[in-house]
Amino acid sequence: MTMCSGARLALLVYGIIMHNSVSCSPAAGLSFPGIRPEEEAYDQDGNPLQDFYDWDPPGAGSPASALRDAYALYYPADRRDVAHEILNEAYRKVLDQLSARKYLQSMVARGMGENLAAAAVDDRAPLTKRHSDGIFTDSYSRYRKQMAVKKYLAAVLGKRYKQRVKNKGRRIAYL
């Protein structure tokens, strides 16, 4: 509704400007490049007079320029700068909140929601690096557990485990 009324206001202002420029201009606000006077007109000193067919009246412009002029008339530059600054601050706050919310959701999804203080210290590392580090840590801890189980089995089974390794030529996993 507000955009519609704003567009109507801009159209009204543009219509008023165009109406005034058409009724007040010597060439009726229109340029006819194909129509030229037969002879040129000169003033008292012999200088040629201005050609009204090549002259653009100051009020006739594109609708965008009329809208800019109306905007500049009602909203001075100093007020616009303050408004833009306030808008930029609010936009930045909203983006910060969205990024923080997205970060917290990713932390909860990964199951690290209980360790937020430690994660906040390491904010500089990208999430992909953290993810790959987590995969490596999980794989390495799994490997260490497997080696511990093999070592335990070797100690319990003793000689029998070593014989099987020699006979087969490779290690036998008891997992």
Swiss-Prot record:
GO CC term (a single one): terminal bouton
Region named Important for receptor binding: 149-157
Removed propeptide positions: 25-78, 172-175
Entry's Gene Ontology molecular function annotations: neuropeptide hormone activity; peptide hormone receptor binding; pituitary adenylate cyclase activating polypeptide activity; pituitary adenylate cyclase-activating polypeptide receptor binding; signaling receptor binding; type 1 vasoactive intestinal polypeptide receptor binding; type 2 vasoactive intestinal polypeptide receptor binding
Xref: InterPro entries: Glucagon_GIP_secretin_VIP, VIP/GHRH-like
Location of this chain's protein in the cell: Secreted
Leader sequence residues: 1-24
Modified sites of kind Leucine amide: 157
Gene Ontology terms: biological process: adenylate cyclase-activating G protein-coupled receptor signaling pathway; adenylate cyclase-modulating G protein-coupled receptor signaling pathway; behavioral fear response; cellular response to glucocorticoid stimulus; histamine secretion; insulin secretion; negative regulation of acute inflammatory response to antigenic stimulus; negative regulation of acute inflammatory response to non-antigenic stimulus
UniProt entry keywords in alphabetical sequence: Amidation, Cleavage on pair of basic residues, Hormone, Neurogenesis, Secreted, Signal
Modified residues (Lysine amide): 168
Family: Belongs to the glucagon family.
Function: PACAP is a neuropeptide involved in diverse array of physiological processes through activating the PACAP subfamily of class B1 G protein-coupled receptors: VIP receptor 1 (VIPR1), VIP receptor 2 (VIPR2), and PACAP type I receptor (ADCYAP1R1). Exerts neuroprotective and general cytoprotective effects due to anti-apoptotic, anti-inflammatory, and antioxidant actions. Promotes neuron projection development through the RAPGEF2/Rap1/B-Raf/ERK pathway. In chromaffin cells, induces long-lasting increase of intracellular calcium concentrations and neuroendocrine secretion.
Designated name of the protein: Pituitary adenylate cyclase-activating polypeptide
Organism of this sequence: Rattus norvegicus (Rat)
Originating gene: Adcyap1
